[in-house]
C-alpha cells in the first residue's frame, strides 16, 4: 500500500514538473499545423505470408487462405487441380500503409501486417507481393518483404508463455510507391493551414505572425484566421509557393490550449494541464470493501444409514470501511490542486472518481476528457 502511494505521488510530481513551463509556449508553425492539401492517405491490401514454421492458418478453418494459395500458384503457372493442400506455413493477412503527401513513385513506406485467419504467429514469415489500393480503388503501392514481429510465443504440452502480439508485425520500407497522388499544389493560389489542436487564440496568433512576415517581405497582409482550426494564406503574385511555405512553416507562434484534464479509466492515468483551476470545494473520500468467503462443509451420513453425503454451504460476509478524510481543495494553481488530492491519500481510481464528482458539482474549471 505504501509503495503504491509513493509511486502515485512520484507520478503526480513528474506531471507537475512537466507543466512548470509557461502556459503560452513558442513553437514553429510546422510543429503545430499542417497543410490541408498535404494530408496522408490510407492504403489497404490482401496478401499471403509464407515461410512460417507451422504457425500459419489451418486451411480447414480458413478456406479463404486455401483459395488464395491456389490462385497464387495458378498465376505462377502451377496447376493445383486434384490435390489437397495441408500446409500450415502460410497465413492470410491484411496489409495497411500510409501514403505520405507529395510522395513520388519509387519511394518506400512502411507497411503493417495483421493476420486474418487462425495463425498463431507471423514470426519469420515473408509477405508475398501485395497490391495496396486507396479509397478510390486505384493501386498506389506494392508491398513485399520480411516481417518484423516484436512479440513471441512458446508452448509446451502443459504450459505456454507469450508476450506481446505475434499475429501482427511490420515490414520496414516494405512498400514501393508506384503511383503518385494528383496534386495541384504548385498551381494553387491559396494555402490552408490546419492546427493539430484547434484554438482561436493560436489561429489568430498564427495569422498575425504570417502577416508580420508578409508585410516585411511582400508589403501586405496575406493570412486570415477562418476559424479555430484553419488559417487561409493567399499567395502573392510574384512568390514561389514552395519557398513561401518553407518560410511560413519556420515562423514562431505563441500556442495556447484550453484547460483540460485527461483521464484514462483503463490504465488509471491522469494528466492535468497547468491552466486547470478548481473552485473551493470540500471532498470526503472513503472506500467500502465487501469480502464474501465461501467455505462449504461436507456432511457424512450416520453409519449403516441409507443417507447420502451432502455439501452444506457456509458463507461469511465481511465489510470494512476505510478513509473518510475530508479535505478542502482550492486549486488556484496546479501545485495546490495536486497537494490537496495527495493529502487525501487515495489511489488513482479514487482520484478519477473525485475529479468526476468535482466536475459534476461545477467546481472544476476545465474540460474533463474520459478515455
From Swiss-Prot:
It comes from the Bacteria. Coiled coil: none annotated. GO terms for cellular component: bacterial-type flagellum basal body, distal rod, P ring; outer membrane-bounded periplasmic space. Keywords: Bacterial flagellum, Periplasm, Signal. Residues 1-25 form the signal peptide. One of its GO terms (biological process) is bacterial-type flagellum-dependent cell motility. GO terms for molecular function: structural molecule activity. It holds the Pfam family FlgI. InterPro entries: Flag_FlgI. It is found in: Periplasm; Bacterial flagellum basal body. The basal body constitutes a major portion of the flagellar organelle and consists of four rings (L,P,S, and M) mounted on a central rod. Belongs to the FlgI family. NCBIfam families: PRK05303.1. Assembles around the rod to form the L-ring and probably protects the motor/basal body from shearing forces during rotation. This is Flagellar P-ring protein. It comes from Sinorhizobium fredii (strain NBRC 101917 / NGR234).
Amino acid at each position: 500500500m505504501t509503495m503504491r502511494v509513493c509511486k502515485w505521488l512520484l507520478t503526480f510530481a513528474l506531471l507537475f514538473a512537466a507543466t512548470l513551463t509557461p502556459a503560452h509556449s513558442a513553437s514553429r508553425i510546422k510543429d503545430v499545423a499542417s497543410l490541408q492539401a498535404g494530408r496522408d492517405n490510407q492504403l489497404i491490401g490482401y496478401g499471403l505470408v509464407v515461410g512460417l514454421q507451422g504457425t500459419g492458418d489451418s486451411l480447414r478453418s480458413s478456406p479463404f487462405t486455401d483459395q488464395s494459395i491456389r490462385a497464387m500458384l495458378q498465376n505462377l503457372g502451377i496447376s493445383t487441380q486434384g490435390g489437397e493442400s495441408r500446409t500450415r506455413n502460410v497465413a492470410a493477412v491484411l496489409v495497411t500503409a500510409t501514403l505520405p503527401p507529395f510522395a513520388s513513385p519509387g519511394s518506400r513506406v512502411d507497411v503493417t501486417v495483421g493476420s486474418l485467419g487462425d495463425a498463431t504467429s507471423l514470426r519469420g514469415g515473408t509477405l508475398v507481393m501485395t497490391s495496396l489500393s486507396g479509397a478510390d480503388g486505384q493501386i498506389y503501392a506494392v508491398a513485399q518483404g520480411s516481417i518484423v514481429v516484436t512479440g513471441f510465443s512458446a508452448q509446451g504440452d502443459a504450459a505456454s508463455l507469450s508476450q506481446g502480439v505475434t499475429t501482427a508485425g511490420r515490414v520496414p520500407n516494405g512498400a514501393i510507391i508506384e503511383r503518385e497522388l494528383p496534386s495541384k499544389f504548385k498551381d494553387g493560389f491559396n494555402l490552408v493551414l490546419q492546427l493539430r489542436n484547434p484554438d482561436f487564440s493560436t489561429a489568430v496568433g498564427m495569422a498575425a505572425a504570417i502577416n508580420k512576415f508578409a508585410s516585411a517581405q511582400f508589403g501586405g497582409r496575406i493570412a486570415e484566421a477562418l476559424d479555430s482550426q484553419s488559417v487561409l494564406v493567399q499567395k502573392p503574385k510574384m512568390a514561389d509557393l514552395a519557398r513561401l511555405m518553407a518560410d511560413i512553416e519556420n515562423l514562431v507562434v505563441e500556442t495556447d490550449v484550453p484547460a483540460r484534464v485527461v483521464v484514462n479509466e483503463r490504465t488509471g492515468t491522469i494528466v492535468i494541464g497547468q491552466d486547470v483551476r478548481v473552485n473551493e470545494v470540500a471532498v470526503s473520500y472513503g472506500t467500502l470493501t465487501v469480502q464474501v468467503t465461501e467455505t462449504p462443509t461436507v456432511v457424512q451420513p450416520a453409519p449403516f444409514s441409507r443417507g447420502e453425503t451432502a455439501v452444506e454451504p457456509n458463507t461469511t460476509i465481511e465489510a470494512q470501511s476505510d478513509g473518510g478524510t475530508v479535505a478542502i481543495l482550492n486549486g488556484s494553481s496546479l501545485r495546490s490542486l495536486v497537494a490537496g488530492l495527495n493529502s487525501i491519500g487515495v489511489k488513482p481510481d479514487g482520484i478519477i472518481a473525485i475529479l468526476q464528482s468535482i466536475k459534476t458539482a461545477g467546481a472544476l474549471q476545465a474540460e474533463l476528457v474520459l478515455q
